[in-house]
């Protein structure tokens, strides 16, 4: 799909700071330093591949080290290989040895640095000091990185030339000509509001909606669009100037769309499929989301697990023999809507006959029916009741998990 790459203009110190009266509205843009193998450093606003641009965007890969899988009973182990789509990205969830490989998902705001370790590998250094070795699994590994260097302008650095990417707070002396897309999305399950990534891709006012009309092909900047509504297999597009268009013939405007992502503060990130989507109404805003410093250092998950025999186990927890830190995510689905919820936002998980009831710290409740973290596909829970004592519970023996 054709995209505009010249979407950023950096303004160095001494220039006018757009929106300074509003604080620092551009704080949500990715910013950092790219060190190359030739020992050069480039510093500025970053776009990861052609998609991720903000601290709440996700870096996706596959975990190479699975320290908790050894507690899975022998009878539940096996060998499989499967390619699945996670929030618009193809993720290879191959089985390695006897254990299921697991997806790695972290917000860029939780990451200190990323160091390539080969064509398909990288070491991800997280706030708090932990390091995850990841291996392939999505186009976030091995992709080109665009950095808008403060002195040189736009630089496109191939993955194989990168030695290290170090993230840091976005300074107030940068000006970005594009706005971040935000608005309200109406679905069959209600309304979601927040920042929007259309087709799991377009997130800026300068990105374009591609489609065909009766009069020919069109490529419309999102900044000129007021709303998009599903009409069968087509889309009704209303422009800011009041005109209405019917578009078809591309994954931006028909059922082949890869999903509409909404960063809804109530839940985290939701992905809305075509069948659930009804309409999006965009709103103009200079807000770009949380700043890098707004993401605290993560910590281990702790809480209480009650089993079906009435016993209570308190301590450190690994959910699904995988997620054990607050930077990680709980995923589940219902009605063609996928939820990727930061574990720091989860208050409790209660397995049901079908899926789980998930209660969030903000008070929202979700009855999720699909997803490995919330269904009978889960590998269960591991609880460190003492530093040297661990208790494993299969998922069908878990009555409720309450997180501290």
PLM features per residue range, with description:
Residues 1-5:
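Positively charged n-region of N-terminal signal peptides that target proteins for export
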Residues 7-16:
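Bacterial N-terminal signal peptides
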Residues 22-404:
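Compositionally biased alpha-helical segments
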């Amino acid at each position: 799909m054709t995209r505009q790459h010249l979407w950023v203009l950096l303004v160095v110190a001494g220039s006018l700071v757009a929106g300074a009266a509003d604080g620092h509205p551009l704080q949500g843009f990715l910013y950092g330093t790219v060190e190359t193998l030739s020992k050069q450093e480039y510093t500025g606003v970053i776009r990861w591949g052609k998609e991720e641009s903000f601290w709440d965007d996700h870096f996706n890969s596959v975990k190479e080290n699975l320290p908790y899988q050894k507690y899975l009973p022998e009878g539940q182990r096996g060998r499989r290989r499967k390619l699945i789509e996670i929030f618009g990205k193809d993720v290879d969830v191959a089985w390695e040895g006897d254990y299921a490989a697991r997806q790695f998902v972290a917000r860029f705001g939780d990451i200190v640095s990323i160091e390539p370790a080969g064509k398909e590998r990288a070491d991800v250094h997280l706030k708090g000091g932990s390091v995850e070795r990841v291996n392939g699994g999505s186009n976030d590994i091995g992709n080109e990185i665009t950095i808008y260097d403060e002195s040189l302008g736009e630089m496109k650095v191939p993955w194989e030339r990168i030695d290290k990417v170090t993230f840091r707070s976005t300074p107030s002396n940068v000006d970005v000509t594009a706005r971040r897309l935000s608005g309200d999305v109406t679905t069959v399950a209600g309304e979601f509001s927040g920042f929007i990534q259309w087709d799991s891709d377009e997130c800026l006012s300068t990105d374009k909606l591609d489609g065909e009309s009766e009069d020919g092909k069109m490529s419309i900047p999102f900044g000129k669009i007021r709303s998009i509504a599903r009409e069968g297999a087509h889309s009704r597009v209303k422009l800011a100037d009041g005109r209405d268009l019917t578009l078809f013939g591309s994954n931006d405007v028909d059922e082949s769309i890869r999903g509409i992502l909404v960063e809804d503060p109530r839940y985290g990130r939701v992905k809305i499929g075509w069948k659930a989507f009804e309409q999006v109404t965009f709103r103009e805003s200079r807000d770009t989301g949380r700043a890098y410093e707004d993401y605290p250092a993560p910590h281990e998950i702790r809480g209480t697990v009650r089993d079906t025999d009435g016993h209570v186990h308190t301590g450190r927890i690994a959910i699904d023999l995988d997620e054990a830190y607050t930077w990680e995510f709980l995923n589940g689905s219902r009605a063609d809507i996928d939820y990727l919820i930061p574990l720091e936002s989860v208050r409790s998980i209660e397995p049901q006959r079908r899926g789980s009831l998930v209660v969030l710290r903000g008070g929202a409740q979700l009855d999720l029916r699909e997803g490995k973290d919330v269904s009978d596909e889960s590998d269960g829970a591991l609880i460190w009741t003492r530093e040297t004592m661990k208790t494993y519970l299969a998922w069908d023996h878990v009555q409720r998990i309450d997180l501290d």
